UniProtKB/Swiss-Prot annotation:
Domain of life: Eukaryota
Protein name from the UniProt record: NADH-ubiquinone oxidoreductase chain 4L
Reactions catalysed, as given in the entry: a ubiquinone + NADH + 5 H(+)(in) = a ubiquinol + NAD(+) + 4 H(+)(out)
Record field: transmembrane: 1-21, 25-45, 59-81
Natural source organism: Equus caballus (Horse)
Protein location: Mitochondrion inner membrane
Phylogenetic classification of the source organism: Eukaryota, Metazoa, Chordata, Craniata, Vertebrata
Topology term for the membrane: Multi-pass membrane protein
Main location: mitochondrion
Quaternary structure (record): Core subunit of respiratory chain NADH dehydrogenase (Complex I) which is composed of 45 different subunits.
InterPro entries: NADH_UbQ_OxRdtase_chain4L/K, NUOK/Mnh_C1-like
UniProt keyword list: Electron transport, Membrane, Mitochondrion, Mitochondrion inner membrane, NAD, Respiratory chain, Translocase, Transmembrane, Transmembrane helix, Transport, Ubiquinone
Amino acid sequence: MSLVHINIFLAFTVSLVGLLMYRSHLMSSLLCLEGMMLSLFVMATMMVLNTHFTLASMMPIILLVFAACERALGLSLLVMVSNTYGVDHVQNLNLLQC
């Protein structure tokens, strides 16, 4: 395993630990999710380029599409919660249940 792979895996792990530890604000959770998706994108791109597997060449693009959808839903939820309650605490999301 090269140093680049270790650094990308470490970035994913740090983002995951940040997501698990700092769950008080929605914005910090969204930033940690974004870091995870970025490291997954880089890992998928490197895998496709290193293995020359042409059938999987669309996988990084599909991952970016899902990341954009996740980003849009997360930001719309952030705007809705902060307009309704005035703060972006994750604990306010429990009040949105039907």
